[in-house]
Amino acid sequence: MDLTARENIYLNGTVLGLTPKYIDEKFDEIVDFSELREFLDVPLKNYSSGMVARIAFAIATITKPDVLIADEILSVGDFMFQEKCEERMRQLMSGGTTVLLVSHSIGQIERMCDHVTWLEKGRVKMQGEAAEVCAAYKALDPEAAAIQGSVKTKK
């Protein structure tokens, strides 16, 4: 099935429980957020992973969900779009949405989360306040944490 982004917006919106009328009303807002208007009629199979993520995130966040699960959604795409998505998640959280963010970016976890569950090989290694869990994680490999840009070190 070679759906275009336009068709995918309607399909995924419907899967999320949105009516075609609601999708019609929010279509431009979805497309504008994704910044992919010129690619709307291109089959998704020709999209990069970052482009697919843009469309998916824009659709999933057009409503004010009770819970948003963002599983590595920001691991693809450019920095500016990641920032835009983080801001959208902050807006949703301030409106009462619970965001479950799955990420390998310690910096992103520090910026976005207040509680963290650290998983290692599928098991809970640590759970608690974000600052405490992130500090424990960075203590294991401060060099890797510095590479991710989340730790300032003195020489």
Where are these regions (language model features)?
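H-loop/switch region of ABC-family ATPase nucleotide-binding domains
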Residues: 103-104
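Helical segment within the ABC ATPase nucleotide-binding domain
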Residues: 82-95
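Conserved ABC ATPase "signature" C-loop
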Residues: 121-122, 137
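A short, surface-exposed alpha-helical micro-motif characterized by mixed small hydrophobic
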Residues: 109-111
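Conserved ABC ATPase "signature" region
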Residues: 10, 22-39, 58
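A short, proline-enriched helix->beta-strand linker immediately N-terminal to the Walker B motif
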Residues: 61-70, 76
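ABC ATPase "signature
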Residues: 127-128
